[in-house]
């Protein structure tokens, strides 16, 4: 756990009042407007084995062409690709050389296609290591009626190719193509804002944190026992000072200020509905203003719930920051649910923004259907925001003129 979590802010400067939907936190958030255009590259590869190439190299005449199978990518449906190999050279002037070309063809003979691509040729040895390589960039322009355009190498010295022939007399060619589809059709998307809670108080000195936790561990001068855990499960006792509990929780203050309360008479507080881990985190925070225990996302939710129950707002905000720092596609729906349940505005807004930006991945989760059935109001609100964001993310792309 980082020092930011271990040696956090002194919650004694922050009022621990009950939270509700109408309450607004005392923290400040840093807001900024940011967008991103991501024209992703498409990479195609073709591996082609030409058997008995040693004989082909000796006996092929100029103009004799071998062709690979046609390959394509569904993201570029208008174009397909093929390798063309001339063991004896493409023309008479290319004799004693090998010619290799990459051909792009339009999938529709009546359609004009223009693509700029980087293409790489490799001849691979028996260990699949490149013995020959070449990199070029070309603009492929296929237009009717021919419908195809080639770029490549006319004069690869025969000696270089011979050095690449494998022990089984074959030649293995690997071709890598990288291209970007029409970038003008790539929408610009708003970058989700994941705000950071800036605690409105000073940093706690490390020595103070350590001395407070040492006092808790020693049990010196304690006058109260907290028993945590269900009656039929794992339980743990914590020896604490009553004044610490009263100072940082309105609920404990009310409980321990009345002599007729059972907890005050028995000097014992039973917490049956939370695990010892969650109670330990709460007690550590009451003493030192930090959560020393290493807690995961699910435990942070439990600690946030116990902070809500005992009205320790600073602890609740610390858990909120813990969840913000670990927000991802797999837990965003669960975090939205908890943020709504415990009235954590910053976490809720960040989760919604994150879910909108990653809506395709979020809606593909197996938990998405459960979220719709279990939280229909939340799901409806989120879907509405997703639709509005999609409508406003980018102006409509103009259709090209025919």
From Swiss-Prot:
Domain BTB: 222-295
Superkingdom of the source species: Eukaryota
Matching PROSITE patterns: BTB (PS50097), MATH (PS50144)
SUPFAM superfamilies: POZ domain, TRAF domain-like
Keywords from the UniProt entry: Ubl conjugation pathway
UniProt-listed InterPro entries: BTB/POZ_dom, MATH/TRAF_dom, SKP1/BTB/POZ_sf, TRAF-like
KW Repressor (keyword) present: no
GO-annotated molecular function: ubiquitin protein ligase binding
An annotated GO BP: proteasome-mediated ubiquitin-dependent protein catabolic process
Function: Probable substrate-specific adapter of an E3 ubiquitin-protein ligase complex which mediates the ubiquitination and subsequent proteasomal degradation of target proteins.
Oligomer status and interactors: Interacts with cul-3.
Name used for this protein in its record: BTB and MATH domain-containing protein 40
């Amino acid at each position: 756990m980082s020092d930011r979590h271990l040696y956090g802010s002194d919650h004694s400067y922050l009022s621990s009042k009950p939270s509700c939907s109408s309450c607004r936190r005392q923290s400040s958030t840093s807001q900024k407007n940011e967008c991103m255009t991501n024209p992703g590259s498409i990479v195609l590869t073709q591996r082609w084995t030409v058997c008995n190439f040693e004989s082909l190299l000796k006996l092929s005449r100029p103009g004799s062409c071998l062709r690979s199978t046609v390959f394509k990518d569904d993201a570029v449906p208008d174009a397909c690709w093929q390798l063309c190999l001339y063991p004896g050279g493409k023309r008479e002037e290319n004799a004693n050389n090998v010619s290799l070309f990459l051909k792009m063809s339009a999938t529709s003979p009546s359609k004009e296609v223009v693509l700029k691509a980087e293409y790489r040729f490799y001849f691979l040895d028996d260990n699949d290591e490149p013995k020959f390589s070449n990199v070029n960039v070309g603009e492929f322009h296929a237009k009717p009626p021919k419908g195809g355009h080639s770029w490549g190498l006319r004069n690869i010295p025969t000696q270089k190719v011979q050095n690449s022939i494998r022990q089984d007399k074959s030649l293995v060619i690997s071709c890598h193509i990288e291209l970007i589809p029409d970038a003008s059709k790539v929408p610009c998307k708003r970058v989700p804002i994941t705000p950071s809670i800036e605690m409105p108080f000073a940093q706690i000195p490390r020595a103070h944190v350590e001395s407070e936790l040492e006092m808790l561990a020693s049990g010196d001068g304690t006058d109260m026992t907290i028993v945590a855990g269900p009656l039929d499960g794992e339980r743990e006792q914590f020896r604490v000072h009553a004044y610490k509990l009263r100072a940082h929780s309105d609920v404990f203050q009310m409980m321990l200020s009345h002599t007729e309360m059972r907890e005050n008479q028995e000097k014992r507080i039973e917490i049956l509905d939370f695990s010892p881990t969650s109670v330990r985190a709460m007690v550590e925070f009451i003493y030192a203003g930090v959560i020393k225990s290493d807690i995961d996302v699910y435990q942070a939710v439990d600690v946030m719930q116990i902070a809500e129950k005992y009205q320790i707002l600073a602890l609740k905000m610390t858990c909120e920051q813990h969840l913000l720092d670990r927000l991802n596609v797999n837990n965003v729906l669960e975090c939205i649910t908890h943020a709504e349940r415990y009235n954590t505005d910053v976490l809720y807004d960040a989760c919604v923004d994150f879910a909108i930006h990653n809506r395709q991945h979020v809606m593909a989760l197996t938990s998405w259907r459960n979220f719709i059935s279990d939280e229909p109001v939340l799901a409806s609100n989120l879907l509405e925001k997703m639709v509005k964001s999609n409508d406003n993310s980018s102006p409509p792309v103009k259709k090209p003129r025919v």
